[in-house]
Amino acid sequence: LYKLTGSFQNPGPYAGFLATIFPLLLQFFLQESSIKNKWLRLLMILLCNIGMLLFLSILPATMSRAAWLAVILGSSFVLSQHYKLYDRLRLFVAKHKKMTLPSFCMLGLLIAALCIGIYYLKKDSADGRLLMWKVTTHIIVEHPWFGVGIGGFSGAYGKAQANYFVSGKATEQEEYLAGSPEYAFNEFLHIAAETGLIGLFLFLGLLCASFWLAYKCRQWGVVGSLSALLTFSCFSYPFSIWQHMLLLVLLLAMCGNNRQEFHRRVDYRMVIILSIVLFLSKRLQ
Protein backbone atom coordinates (compact mmCIF):
# COMPACT_ATOMS: atom_id res chain seq x y z
CA LEU A 1 0.00 0.00 0.00
CA TYR A 2 2.84 2.38 0.88
CA LYS A 3 6.21 2.52 -0.85
CA LEU A 4 8.17 4.17 1.97
CA THR A 5 7.53 2.60 5.38
CA GLY A 6 10.90 1.40 6.65
CA SER A 7 10.27 -1.03 9.51
CA PHE A 8 6.75 0.29 10.09
CA GLN A 9 3.34 -0.30 8.55
CA ASN A 10 2.97 3.22 7.13
CA PRO A 11 5.17 6.28 6.51
CA GLY A 12 3.89 8.30 9.50
CA PRO A 13 5.51 6.34 12.36
CA TYR A 14 8.61 5.80 10.22
CA ALA A 15 9.00 9.54 9.71
CA GLY A 16 8.34 10.19 13.40
CA PHE A 17 11.06 7.74 14.40
CA LEU A 18 13.59 9.42 12.10
CA ALA A 19 12.53 12.88 13.29
CA THR A 20 13.08 11.84 16.91
CA ILE A 21 16.59 10.53 16.31
CA PHE A 22 17.73 13.47 14.16
CA PRO A 23 18.30 16.08 16.95
CA LEU A 24 20.40 13.59 18.92
CA LEU A 25 22.42 12.79 15.81
CA LEU A 26 22.85 16.51 15.18
CA GLN A 27 24.19 16.98 18.69
CA PHE A 28 26.69 14.16 18.18
CA PHE A 29 27.87 15.86 15.00
CA LEU A 30 28.25 19.27 16.65
CA GLN A 31 30.25 17.96 19.60
CA GLU A 32 32.46 15.44 17.78
CA SER A 33 35.54 17.41 18.91
CA SER A 34 34.97 16.11 22.46
CA ILE A 35 35.96 12.59 21.33
CA LYS A 36 39.70 12.21 21.90
CA ASN A 37 40.30 9.06 19.89
CA LYS A 38 41.12 10.13 16.33
CA TRP A 39 39.66 7.11 14.54
CA LEU A 40 36.56 7.05 16.69
CA ARG A 41 36.05 10.75 16.00
CA LEU A 42 36.37 10.18 12.24
CA LEU A 43 33.93 7.27 12.48
CA MET A 44 31.44 9.45 14.34
CA ILE A 45 31.76 12.23 11.75
CA LEU A 46 31.21 9.73 8.93
CA LEU A 47 28.21 8.08 10.59
CA CYS A 48 26.62 11.41 11.51
CA ASN A 49 27.05 12.84 8.01
CA ILE A 50 25.65 9.74 6.33
CA GLY A 51 22.80 9.52 8.83
CA MET A 52 21.75 13.15 8.54
CA LEU A 53 21.91 13.08 4.73
CA LEU A 54 19.76 9.95 4.63
CA PHE A 55 17.29 11.34 7.15
CA LEU A 56 16.94 14.66 5.32
CA SER A 57 16.41 12.87 2.01
CA ILE A 58 13.80 10.46 3.40
CA LEU A 59 11.71 12.78 5.61
CA PRO A 60 10.29 14.94 2.78
CA ALA A 61 9.25 11.83 0.85
CA THR A 62 7.20 10.50 3.79
CA MET A 63 4.81 13.48 3.52
CA SER A 64 4.44 13.47 7.31
CA ARG A 65 3.80 17.05 8.37
CA ALA A 66 4.00 16.11 12.04
CA ALA A 67 7.49 14.68 11.52
CA TRP A 68 8.59 17.79 9.64
CA LEU A 69 7.43 20.00 12.50
CA ALA A 70 9.05 17.68 15.05
CA VAL A 71 12.47 17.68 13.39
CA ILE A 72 12.37 21.47 12.93
CA LEU A 73 11.56 22.16 16.58
CA GLY A 74 13.95 19.55 18.00
CA SER A 75 16.87 20.57 15.78
CA SER A 76 16.21 24.28 16.35
CA PHE A 77 16.61 23.75 20.07
CA VAL A 78 19.91 21.90 19.63
CA LEU A 79 21.27 24.58 17.30
CA SER A 80 20.07 27.41 19.54
CA GLN A 81 21.89 25.95 22.55
CA HIS A 82 25.06 25.04 20.67
CA TYR A 83 25.44 28.43 19.00
CA LYS A 84 23.89 30.42 21.89
CA LEU A 85 21.26 31.90 19.59
CA TYR A 86 19.29 33.33 22.51
CA ASP A 87 22.24 35.51 23.55
CA ARG A 88 22.79 36.53 19.93
CA LEU A 89 19.13 37.46 19.64
CA ARG A 90 19.31 39.63 22.74
CA LEU A 91 22.34 41.44 21.33
CA PHE A 92 20.55 41.96 18.03
CA VAL A 93 17.51 43.41 19.79
CA ALA A 94 19.72 45.70 21.87
CA LYS A 95 21.64 46.99 18.84
CA HIS A 96 18.75 47.20 16.36
CA LYS A 97 15.71 48.20 18.38
CA LYS A 98 13.97 49.82 15.42
CA MET A 99 14.30 46.66 13.33
CA THR A 100 13.06 44.33 16.06
CA LEU A 101 9.31 44.78 15.58
CA PRO A 102 9.35 44.58 11.75
CA SER A 103 11.64 41.54 11.92
CA PHE A 104 9.35 39.68 14.32
CA CYS A 105 6.29 40.64 12.26
CA MET A 106 7.90 39.24 9.12
CA LEU A 107 8.89 36.08 10.98
CA GLY A 108 5.35 35.71 12.30
CA LEU A 109 3.88 36.11 8.81
CA LEU A 110 6.34 33.56 7.44
CA ILE A 111 5.42 31.03 10.13
CA ALA A 112 1.69 31.66 9.58
CA ALA A 113 2.07 31.18 5.82
CA LEU A 114 4.04 27.98 6.40
CA CYS A 115 1.38 26.60 8.76
CA ILE A 116 -1.42 27.43 6.31
CA GLY A 117 0.51 25.79 3.49
CA ILE A 118 1.07 22.63 5.54
CA TYR A 119 -2.62 22.56 6.48
CA TYR A 120 -3.82 22.76 2.88
CA LEU A 121 -1.22 20.24 1.74
CA LYS A 122 -3.45 17.47 3.19
CA LYS A 123 -6.57 19.36 4.27
CA ASP A 124 -8.88 16.37 4.75
CA SER A 125 -6.32 14.65 6.94
CA ALA A 126 -5.98 17.75 9.11
CA ASP A 127 -9.76 18.18 9.37
CA GLY A 128 -10.09 14.52 10.32
CA ARG A 129 -7.67 15.00 13.20
CA LEU A 130 -9.57 18.07 14.37
CA LEU A 131 -12.76 15.99 14.47
CA MET A 132 -11.02 13.23 16.45
CA TRP A 133 -9.66 15.74 18.95
CA LYS A 134 -13.10 17.33 19.36
CA VAL A 135 -14.79 13.98 20.01
CA THR A 136 -11.98 12.93 22.36
CA THR A 137 -12.51 16.06 24.46
CA HIS A 138 -16.14 14.98 24.87
CA ILE A 139 -14.89 11.66 26.28
CA ILE A 140 -12.62 13.50 28.71
CA VAL A 141 -15.48 15.75 29.85
CA GLU A 142 -17.67 12.69 30.52
CA HIS A 143 -14.89 10.77 32.32
CA PRO A 144 -12.60 13.50 33.69
CA TRP A 145 -10.71 11.88 36.55
CA PHE A 146 -10.07 8.22 35.77
CA GLY A 147 -10.96 7.99 32.07
CA VAL A 148 -12.55 5.02 30.32
CA GLY A 149 -9.73 2.62 31.15
CA ILE A 150 -6.67 1.52 29.23
CA GLY A 151 -7.74 -0.01 25.93
CA GLY A 152 -11.23 1.47 26.12
CA PHE A 153 -10.68 4.41 23.80
CA SER A 154 -12.05 2.86 20.61
CA GLY A 155 -15.41 1.88 22.12
CA ALA A 156 -15.79 5.16 24.00
CA TYR A 157 -14.94 7.11 20.85
CA GLY A 158 -17.66 5.37 18.84
CA LYS A 159 -20.30 6.26 21.43
CA ALA A 160 -19.09 9.85 21.82
CA GLN A 161 -19.01 10.38 18.05
CA ALA A 162 -22.53 8.96 17.66
CA ASN A 163 -23.82 11.29 20.39
CA TYR A 164 -22.10 14.23 18.72
CA PHE A 165 -23.77 13.50 15.38
CA VAL A 166 -27.17 12.95 17.02
CA SER A 167 -26.89 16.36 18.68
CA GLY A 168 -27.01 17.98 15.24
CA LYS A 169 -23.87 20.05 15.83
CA ALA A 170 -21.73 18.19 13.30
CA THR A 171 -21.06 19.69 9.88
CA GLU A 172 -21.36 17.86 6.57
CA GLN A 173 -17.57 17.82 6.28
CA GLU A 174 -17.28 16.16 9.70
CA GLU A 175 -19.86 13.53 8.74
CA TYR A 176 -17.87 12.84 5.58
CA LEU A 177 -14.60 12.47 7.51
CA ALA A 178 -16.02 10.40 10.37
CA GLY A 179 -14.45 7.03 11.05
CA SER A 180 -13.71 4.57 13.84
CA PRO A 181 -10.10 5.29 14.88
CA GLU A 182 -8.25 3.25 17.46
CA TYR A 183 -6.19 6.26 18.52
CA ALA A 184 -6.86 9.93 19.22
CA PHE A 185 -3.89 11.00 17.06
CA ASN A 186 -2.79 13.06 20.04
CA GLU A 187 -1.13 11.08 22.80
CA PHE A 188 -1.91 13.63 25.51
CA LEU A 189 -5.63 13.53 24.70
CA HIS A 190 -5.45 9.74 24.38
CA ILE A 191 -3.86 9.39 27.81
CA ALA A 192 -6.43 11.75 29.33
CA ALA A 193 -9.29 9.82 27.71
CA GLU A 194 -8.09 6.41 28.94
CA THR A 195 -6.55 7.26 32.33
CA GLY A 196 -8.22 10.58 33.12
CA LEU A 197 -6.67 13.85 34.18
CA ILE A 198 -4.90 12.05 37.03
CA GLY A 199 -3.01 9.84 34.58
CA LEU A 200 -2.27 12.80 32.33
CA PHE A 201 -0.86 14.88 35.19
CA LEU A 202 1.33 11.99 36.33
CA PHE A 203 2.69 11.63 32.80
CA LEU A 204 3.28 15.38 32.49
CA GLY A 205 5.06 15.33 35.85
CA LEU A 206 7.42 12.61 34.60
CA LEU A 207 8.13 14.61 31.45
CA CYS A 208 8.77 17.85 33.35
CA ALA A 209 11.17 16.11 35.74
CA SER A 210 13.00 14.48 32.82
CA PHE A 211 13.30 17.75 30.92
CA TRP A 212 14.61 19.49 34.03
CA LEU A 213 17.26 16.81 34.59
CA ALA A 214 18.37 16.81 30.96
CA TYR A 215 18.51 20.60 30.80
CA LYS A 216 20.43 20.78 34.06
CA CYS A 217 22.97 18.31 32.67
CA ARG A 218 23.15 20.31 29.42
CA GLN A 219 22.14 17.33 27.32
CA TRP A 220 20.79 19.35 24.43
CA GLY A 221 20.51 16.40 22.06
CA VAL A 222 18.34 14.47 24.51
CA VAL A 223 16.11 17.50 25.11
CA GLY A 224 15.84 18.07 21.36
CA SER A 225 14.96 14.45 20.59
CA LEU A 226 12.47 14.25 23.45
CA SER A 227 10.89 17.50 22.25
CA ALA A 228 10.68 16.10 18.72
CA LEU A 229 9.00 12.91 19.94
CA LEU A 230 6.47 14.82 22.03
CA THR A 231 5.76 17.20 19.14
CA PHE A 232 5.13 14.24 16.87
CA SER A 233 2.92 12.66 19.55
CA CYS A 234 0.60 15.68 19.38
CA PHE A 235 -0.46 14.61 15.89
CA SER A 236 0.04 10.84 15.83
CA TYR A 237 0.10 7.70 17.99
CA PRO A 238 3.79 6.86 18.68
CA PHE A 239 3.14 5.50 22.19
CA SER A 240 1.14 2.67 20.64
CA ILE A 241 4.19 1.50 18.67
CA TRP A 242 6.87 -0.47 20.51
CA GLN A 243 9.80 1.06 18.63
CA HIS A 244 8.76 4.56 19.67
CA MET A 245 8.14 3.44 23.24
CA LEU A 246 11.61 1.88 23.40
CA LEU A 247 13.05 5.13 22.09
CA LEU A 248 11.10 7.10 24.71
CA VAL A 249 12.46 4.88 27.50
CA LEU A 250 16.03 5.31 26.21
CA LEU A 251 15.65 9.10 26.07
CA LEU A 252 14.16 9.28 29.57
CA ALA A 253 16.98 7.08 30.90
CA MET A 254 19.57 9.39 29.33
CA CYS A 255 18.08 12.43 31.07
CA GLY A 256 19.62 11.49 34.41
CA ASN A 257 23.23 11.18 33.24
CA ASN A 258 25.72 13.88 34.11
CA ARG A 259 27.39 15.74 31.25
CA GLN A 260 30.84 14.12 31.53
CA GLU A 261 29.33 10.65 31.64
CA PHE A 262 27.19 11.54 28.65
CA HIS A 263 30.21 12.67 26.64
CA ARG A 264 32.38 9.73 27.63
CA ARG A 265 29.96 6.84 27.27
CA VAL A 266 26.90 7.81 25.29
CA ASP A 267 28.29 9.65 22.28
CA TYR A 268 29.35 6.60 20.29
CA ARG A 269 27.50 3.84 22.13
CA MET A 270 24.14 5.50 21.62
CA VAL A 271 24.65 5.43 17.86
CA ILE A 272 25.32 1.69 18.10
CA ILE A 273 22.25 1.16 20.31
CA LEU A 274 19.99 3.08 17.93
CA SER A 275 21.39 1.09 14.99
CA ILE A 276 20.57 -2.16 16.81
CA VAL A 277 17.04 -0.88 17.50
CA LEU A 278 16.53 -0.13 13.81
CA PHE A 279 17.90 -3.56 12.82
CA LEU A 280 15.76 -5.46 15.34
CA SER A 281 12.63 -3.52 14.43
CA LYS A 282 13.14 -4.60 10.83
CA ARG A 283 13.74 -8.24 11.73
CA LEU A 284 10.73 -8.48 14.05
CA GLN A 285 8.20 -7.12 11.56
What are these regions (language model features)?
Residues 32, 216-217, 251-284:
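A juxtamembrane structural motif centered on a specific transmembrane helix
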Residues 115-131, 270-285:
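Hydrophobic alpha-helical transmembrane segments in integral membrane proteins
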Residues 153, 223-229, 271-274:
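Central hydrophobic cores of alpha-helical transmembrane segments
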Residues 2-4, 110-113, 120-124, 137-142, ...:
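Transmembrane-lumen/periplasm boundary regions of multi-pass, lipid-linked membrane glycan transferases
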Residues 59-62, 146, 155-168, 231-242, ...:
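Membrane-interface helix-loop junctions at the exits of transmembrane helices
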